[in-house]
Curated annotation (Swiss-Prot):
Sequence positions that bind ATP: 628
Protein's name according to its UniProt entry: Isoleucine--tRNA ligase, mitochondrial
One cellular-component annotation, GO: mitochondrial matrix
Source organism (scientific name): Schizosaccharomyces pombe (strain 972 / ATCC 24843)
CDD domains named in the record: Anticodon_Ia_Ile_BEm, IleRS_core
Length: 973
């Protein structure tokens, strides 16, 4: 006969539930009588979540309603401010967005649990090339800047709405109605006022100098917008320039050629000089019919110079007196210039100088009155100024560069052409190679400001600590910040240019006037060319003696997002922002721009944030970085709806996505895939079942049933101390933002302590003792605190699961007074446990728990051996005998004597005695060393019957043990 009367126990916790009882019970009536006398778990909390139903019931209360409640009711003097690094308002969200936003939400919810009000206003970065490109493609015919801006704004607004809804699907709590977007007039005016402040401090300047230029974006880029390809292959050439009138020590040499190496042949039409190093030894070398000037040290490196004959030494101090010709530019002579940046480990020791195409070349040119020459257009094509128009229209990184080499070959200038693999800058948005091109651009001087910013970082906590060096490295490498962009979709730089001369007008008076006009008419009015909005309308009256036109350049998008600190209200005696949390790529981007704009604006070494948290990137299960080209990008929606789980029909909902995020060591790169999600799903299931066990066994209990700490059983006191220790550890981990370690501790605590130790040790009392007995209420007291502790610990990570548990508590619990665990806060969730544990000797009880664990481990070894030898089938068939000469150990064991059988999952434990007629069931473990002394442990066969009610082998011939007979007798009264 089969009988199963309970399904609410977690796996491994149903040893009381009778599956095959006919062998032991005389009748079905007996079975029913005994089963009905047990206090079995009862709960409506399901094993599997009803995702759709839970969303409908709980979602609003733990997101938008909760944020508004805390905003209105919690103390704003102790607020926690997290500034949202704005994602780009372009396209659908990917899993990296989920990682970022959910990490922020977990931290915000933890602060809320502590009773702090949270200020979190999500933001979006709305300007930039990708959106502008979409706007241009959407309308093939040529549009005005104003029309492009209108279309771009529509695209950005649409993306913001789509992304906002997806973030809300992730249960991210925030002030969504007050979100900031960098294209709003309010944000842009605040940004322009920061620009004005920097102008007042003489930090804004214009210069015609080489900048990184993206031909694919048709705009200048800042260092923060550049990525590097370590496998880029350039065409390198060894080539020659003929030296004029070469003589050394009165000896003349004819047809001497300077041997030069370059990886940018396309810059040869812009050559204005050659440079050499004053400390390098140079010589003249004859090879075949040519005489070359080059570094002595580098001759052996060149295969084509094998067998070359050294004719003479050429001291570096006389090289400056020489000139050379460029056969591509006849009838001109060019100088040799001394430079310390020339190296002696690669090339020839002589460097081709093009001040229009390299920063070092530019600086050398400034020292020697060489104006930068860069005959290129915005598309990276030669203009007619290059080689008398022979290269016009050709792309320098394509056919143009090839044609230059061809022309040089025709002039017998080329010695060798070869591919050269090296690190090369790319546009981080278009992923196309960049060039260095001299164009007039606007800059922020960082020579002093970066020192202030670096000093400000001294008071900032960096997570992980090694991220500090990365950020400092970027700051140290920025003498200025190129802030102008040649795009229509962006915040316009409020500069006017004199008509004809193009001399810029950028004064405090002019910029202030323009900003005031924009505040009234809107930023878009700058691009509106109507009769009532001509250029003259934007000119301050003091400057109307000349004719000016409005500039078309816009500000770098990093300047946009970098001024997002303007959305935060200052706080007394506190940093503006408690936390900024973004991906590791933001060391070169937002983290820098936020810090630099703020410290420059404040003119003091004070960072806007107190903590910077950097998370890594996401790879698939094979360790490949997720990218569209590889087809391995994960859509967060596929995690939420269960699509990514192989063979799993049941979606776990947003809690699965959130638990995966929490499980990641976010300070490093992390992995995601079906197998990983399946493991996370198992953890989530464990959290549900552990909570369900507590709920089921608290169905008949309320706070008035709580047992005073002094009356608790020994094992229950130990459990409370372990709970308190767990709370301390969890609190420390949340405070240090070690979220993945919170998950690890949760899983370990549920598995190693609650499920495998405590629950197993107390189930007999829960099910078989009298319902209102102190022994049973003692367990329930611990379960009550365990459940509230679990709710407290998991709420920031899986708020939906926590709310579902909260709503499943009996009506007499806290949920009748507080809508969510966050409303209750940790004061009501866990403080009462601390007051109980304060009455106990924590250190002493922790030590005693460790001794019990040592004993349990040794006994489990004996039980395992007995099972493997087939001497017993079930550990309840065994008795344990512990012998010792240590009075400390004996005293300790007697204090826990009533709990030991249940802790060890055996029917009886004897201390320093062996009843008659017991047979040894396993090999004895001699001299087990414990903290209280040495013990000998033996395992014996039980000599009593299996109790038909509790299954312990402690029964008489009538089928019930003494305890169960007593309980049944009292239940009949």
């Amino acid at each position: 006969m089969k009988f199963s009367y309970i399904s609410s126990l977690p796996k491994g916790h149903n040893h009381i539930c009778c599956k095959q009882a006919g062998r032991f019970l005389s009748s079905q009536a007996d079975l029913k009588k005994y089963s009905e006398s047990l206090c079995l778990p009862k709960t409506s909390f399901p094993i599997k979540p009803n995702v759709k139903g839970n969303n409908e019931k709980y979602f609003k209360s733990i997101t938008s309603d909760l944020y508004e409640w805390q905003k209105e009711n919690l103390n704003k003097e102790d607020s926690f401010v997290l500034l949202d690094g704005p994602p780009f308002a372009n396209g659908r969200l990917h899993i990296g967005h989920a990682l970022n936003k959910i990490l922020k939400d977990i931290i915000n919810r933890w602060q809320l649990l502590k009773g702090r009000s949270v200020h979190y206003v999500p933001g979006w970065d709305c300007h930039g090339l990708p959106i502008e490109s979409k706007a241009i493609k959407a309308n093939a015919e040529r549009k005005s800047s104003l029309e492009i801006r209108k279309i771009a704004k529509d695209f950005a607004n649409s993306a913001v709405q789509e992304q906002l809804m997806m973030f809300q699907r992730m249960a991210v709590m925030g002030d969504w109605p007050s979100r900031y977007i960098t294209m709003s007039d309010k944000f842009e005016i605040a940004e322009l006022k920061v620009f004005l402040s920097l102008l007042q401090k003489d930090l804004i300047f214009r210069q015609n100098k080489p900048v990184y230029w993206s031909s694919s974006s048709r705009s200048a880029l800042a260092e923060s917008e550049i990525e590097y390809d370590d496998n880029h292959v350039s065409t390198s050439i060894y080539f020659t320039f003929p030296v004029n009138s070469f003589s050394i020590d009165g000896c003349e040499y004819n047809n001497v050629k300077a041997l030069v190496w370059t990886t940018t042949p396309w810059t040869i039409p812009s050559n204005l000089a050659l440079s050499y190093h004053p400390e390098i030894n140079y010589g003249l070398y004859q090879h075949n019919n040519s005489i070359y000037l080059m570094s002595d040290n580098l001759v052996p490196n060149l295969d084509f110079m094998q067998g070359a004959k050294r004719l003479a030494s050429c001291p570096s101090d006389i090289i400056s007196s020489f000139t050379y010709e460029n056969p591509l530019l006849p009838k001109q002579s060019f100088p040799f210039l001394q430079s310390n940046y020339v190296t002696n480990d690669i090339g020839t020791g002589i460097v081709h100088v093009a001040p229009g195409h390299g920063m070092e070349d530019y600086l050398l040119g400034l020292e020697n009155n060489l104006r930068p020459f860069s005959p290129l257009d915005d598309y990276g094509r030669y203009t007619k100024e290059a080689l008398d128009g022979s290269l016009e229209g050709l792309e320098v990184l394509g056919d143009g560069g090839k044609k230059v080499i061809s022309i040089m070959k025709n002039q017998n200038m080329i010695v060798k052409v070869s591919p050269y693999k090296h690190r090369y800058p790319y546009d981080w948005r278009t992923h196309k190679p960049l060039i260095l091109r001299a164009t007039p651009q606007w800059f922020i001087s960082l020579e002093n400001e970066r020192k202030t910013a670096i000093k400000a970082l001294d008071s900032v906590k960096m997570i992980p600590p090694n991220s500090r060096a990365r950020l400092l490295g970027f700051l140290n490498g920025r003498p200025e910040w190129c802030i102008s962009r040649q795009r229509a979709w962006g915040l316009p730089i409020p500069v006017l240019y004199e008509k004809g001369t193009k001399i810029p007008l950028l004064t405090v008076k002019s910029v202030s006037y323009i900003i005031e006009k924009m505040e009234v008419e809107g930023v878009d009015s700058w691009f509106n060319d109507t009769e009532n909005n001509g250029h003259a309308q934007w000119v301050h009256p003091d400057y109307r003696n000349k004719e000016y036109i409005r500039g078309t350049e816009t500000l770098d998008v990093w300047f946009d997002s970098g001024t997002s600190w303007t959305t935060i209200a200052p706080r007394k005696n506190k940093p503006l922002i408690d936390l900024c949390l973004e991906g590791s790529d933001q060391h070169r981007g937002w983290f820098q721009s936020l810090l630099l704009t703020y410290t420059a604006y404040q003119s003091k070494p004070e960072a806007p944030f107190s903590t910077l948290f950097t998370h890594g990137f996401i790879f698939d299960e094979r360790g490949q970085k997720q990218s569209k080209s590889l087809g391995n990008v994960t859509d967060p929606e596929d995690v939420i709806n269960g699509k990514l789980l192989k063979g799993k029909k049941l979606p776990y909902g947003v809690d699965l996505l959130r638990l995966w995020v929490a499980s990641c060591d976010s300070t490093n790169d992390t992995n995601l895939g079906p197998n990983i999600l399946t493991q996370v799903g198992e953890s989530l299931k464990k959290w549900r079942l552990t909570s369900r066990f507590c709920l089921g066994n608290l169905h008949d209990w309320n706070t008035s049933s709580s047992v005073d700490v002094g009356e608790l059983r020994g094992i229950d006191k130990l459990a409370l101390v372990q709970l308190d220790k767990f709370q301390t550890e969890i609190r420390e981990l949340y405070e240090s933002y070690s979220i993945n370690k919170v998950v690890h501790h949760l899983n370990y605590f549920m598995n190693s302590f609650l499920s495998s130790t405590y629950f197993d040790a107390v189930k007999d009392r829960l099910y078989a003792d009298l319902p209102n007995s102190v022994s049973r209420r003692s367990v329930q007291t611990v379960l009550y605190h365990s459940l509230l502790t679990l709710i407290w610990a998991i709420s920031p990570i899986t708020p939906l699961l926590a709310q579902e548990i909260w709503q499943s508590l009996p009506d007499s619990y806290l949920n009748s007074s507080y809508q969510t665990p966050f409303h209750a806060g940790e004061t009501h969730l866990i403080s009462s446990l601390r007051s109980k544990v304060d009455l106990l000797d924590r250190k002493f009880l922790i030590k005693e728990y460790l001794v019990l664990q040592q004993l349990k481990y040794s006994i489990n070894l004996l039980i395992t051996a007995a099972r493997e030898n087939l001497t017993i089938k079930n550990s309840l068939e065994a008795y344990v005998v512990i012998k010792s000469k240590s009075q400390s150990l004996l005293s300790f064991l007697k204090n826990y004597s009533s709990d030991l059988p249940f802790l060890f999952n055996t029917s009886k434990v004897f201390i320093n005695e062996i009843p008659e007629n017991l047979k040894l069931a396993s090999v004895t473990q001699p001299e087990v060393q414990l903290d209280y002394g040495v013990a000998n442990i033996s395992l014996f066969f039980s000599n009593q019957q299996k109790c038909l009610r509790c299954w312990m082998h402690t029964a008489h011939e009538d089928g019930l043990c003494d305890r169960c007979e007593s309980v049944l007798a009292q239940l009949k009264r």
